[in-house]
Amino acid sequence: MGAARLGPARPGASDLDQVVVGPVAEPKAYVTDTHPLLLHASGGRGLSRRAAGCYKACEERAAIIYVPMAVLWETSLLARVGRVDLGRSLRAFAEDLFSNPAYQPFDLTAEQVSLADESRPNDDPFDALICASALDLQLPLITRDGPIQEWGRVRTIW
C-alpha cells in the first residue's frame, strides 16, 4: 500500500510537510549541508544513495529541503576562491534553486548564532551555523561531514 498524502498540517503549510506511513505521520523534510547540495547541483555524482534519495524526493516535490543561509554564503565564498564553479552568479544559482518551492531558504537568526557559538561540532563556523539551523528546525541534516556525524547532536543522513 502506498503512502497517502495529508493536507497541510497548519495554516500556510505545504502538503509536502508530511506523508502518512501506516498510522503515524512521518515528516519528509531535511536540512542540507553545503557539500551535498553542490554535489546534487552538479549532477549528483558522489552522493550516497540515501542523500540522493532526499534530493530526488525534493525535485519531485515529495519532500522539502531547507537551505540555511550559511550554505549560500559558504557557496559564494567557495565560488569566489575557485573551489566550485556554479557556472553562473550566486544570485542566478539561488533563483534557480528556489524556483522549486520544495527548496526553502532558511534565514539566519540571532538564536541560531547563539546556539552555534555555544555548541559546535568543530572549528568551522559554517558547520556550526548549519548545525544550528538543523537543531532549530529539529530536522535531519544531509551531510557526510565526519565530525558532524560523530558529534551526535544533529541527526544526519548520508
Regions found by a protein language model. Name each.
Residues 153-158:
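Active-site regions of enzymes building and remodeling cell-envelope glycoconjugates
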Residues 19, 24, 85-87, 99-144:
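Active-site neighborhoods of divalent-metal-dependent phosphate/nucleic-acid chemistry enzymes
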Residues 1-67, 81-96, 137, 147, ...:
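Short, well-structured N-terminal submotif of metal-dependent ribonuclease cores
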Residues 101, 151-152:
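Short, structured coil segments at secondary-structure junctions
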Residues 75:
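Phosphate/NTP-binding elements of NTP-utilizing enzymes
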Residues 78:
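ABC-type ATPase nucleotide-binding domain
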Residues 36, 71, 112, 130, ...:
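Alpha-helix capping/helix-boundary segments
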